[in-house]
Amino acid sequence: MPSANASRKGQEKPREIVDAAEDYAKERYGVSSMIQSQEKPDRVLVRVKDLTVQKADEVVWVRARVHTSRAKGKQCFLVLRQQQFNVQALVAVGDHASKQMVKFAANINKESIIDVEGIVRKVNQKIGSCTQQDVELHVQKIYVISLAEPRLPLQLDDAIRPEVEGEEDGRATVNQDTRLDNRIIDLRTSTSQAIFHLQSGICHLFRETLINKGFVEIQTPKIISAASEGGANVFTVSYFKSNAYLAQSPQLYKQMCICADFEKVFCIGPVFRAEDSNTHRHLTEFVGLDIEMAFNYHYHEVVEEIADTLVQIFKGLQERFQTEIQTVNKQFPCEPFKFLEPTLRLEYCEALAMLREAGVEMDDEEDLSTPNEKLLGRLVKEKYDTDFYVLDKYPLAVRPFYTMPDPRNPKQSNSYDMFMRGEEILSGAQRIHDPQLLTERALHHGIDLEKIKAYIDSFRFGAPPHAGGGIGLERVTMLFLGLHNVRQTSMFPRDPKRLTP
């Protein structure tokens, strides 16, 4: 006589057969075969951000990731995510969906990529958890394009949770090392997507503004034969039967282009610094936005051009990237970035006076420390209501050998830094374009002339007066958004302790 369990199993098998026979939607869901460019169907995929009430009652196809899923009775709610936008989708038993299809949808692993056909429906009550709050997608077909593994190294909801919320209610947040160790997942968050879309906008606006001003974009070598600028903080690489170095800066080549009569040049490219600095704002590799420009009579012509370029970038970001700014602010609240037109320019001696009035003891020829930079930023904000300003006329003693001395005050120089929220984002100067004076200044700094011979020689055939500077892209992004670590704005950051991924 068969056991009760055996009898039960015998009863279940016919039930499975019956369920399969009753699965009238079996052609409407499943796992697609791997896309190997076998065909090109006549199907238009709609972007999630375009799912608005204007598309109500339309049948659309969408490809997105499964952000979350929640089964409830005979229906399943999915949140479908595409970059920084998401929409709610509903799979419910009915004419187009069987209970097997609902179960299939509920069991799709998070982060899997799916194709969905559905009807856009206007909702009566806004869906606060989604960017597309006024509509949802009523699913008719659902196919898995790429299945994610069931165990994720981090949960995206945890990764976008503000730290304050995590501290208050004990919910999980994700620390920086975990994020960077699993950067591919971390970059999928709405915050990361917004950061790097905005960063792309900075590059675009930088290029657009300078081309409109008559600048020429150049490309400079990153593998060089000698330590650029005579500096020591360089990476050495094997170069066939000798050694070469990774460029600390494109400055030499920018200046050579000025000597070659290009007059106004800029470049966007990697910069390498072998500095063992484990701070919130230093990287060993970052993207430099570099400018060099010949001027007629005064280096302030260049200062004004660079400052205006940055102002145009700030304005462009505020006009074109409000969605991204608001997305980042949800996780990292910050006051809007403020700037003046024309840009505030203070002399170094004025900054010293403000700091001394605030109780800081500093010598006239002492450089600003990071804490004093931040304090000065707060003082400037209080007095002038701006987060962006130029500090001019630095002491000659704290600037590189190629910096032009101030002809009226031998202790000062024709050099400047630009600041955002109390942190330096650009360092620049009028360059010495006379080979004799350049040689004297190099000797004064104890630099081996043989190592910078090519640099000095580039000015021996007539060089126009010129000035320039270098901007750190990641630092500008960080400070514009009010973030607290440059690793958040470097897609795959490199610092003294990180060489992967």
UniProtKB/Swiss-Prot annotation:
It is found in: Cytoplasm. The modification Phosphothreonine is found at T52. Keywords: Acetylation, Aminoacyl-tRNA synthetase, ATP-binding, Cytoplasm, Ligase, Nucleotide-binding, Phosphoprotein, Protein biosynthesis. SUPFAM superfamilies: Class II aaRS and biotin synthetases (SSF55681), Nucleic acid-binding proteins (SSF50249). It comes from the Eukaryota. The lineage of its organism: Eukaryota, Metazoa, Chordata, Craniata, Vertebrata. It comes from Rattus norvegicus (Rat). L-aspartate binds at E229, R273, S427, R431. This is Aspartate--tRNA ligase, cytoplasmic. Its main location: cytoplasm. ATP binds at R273, A274, E275, R281, H282, L283, E424, G472, L473, E474, R475. Belongs to the class-II aminoacyl-tRNA synthetase family. Type 2 subfamily. CDD domains: AspRS_cyto_N, AsxRS_core. Catalyzes the specific attachment of an amino acid to its cognate tRNA in a 2 step reaction: the amino acid (AA) is first activated by ATP to form AA-AMP and then transferred to the acceptor end of the tRNA. The gene is Dars1. The modification Phosphoserine is found at S249. The keyword Aminoacyl-tRNA synthetase applies. GO terms for biological process: aspartyl-tRNA aminoacylation.
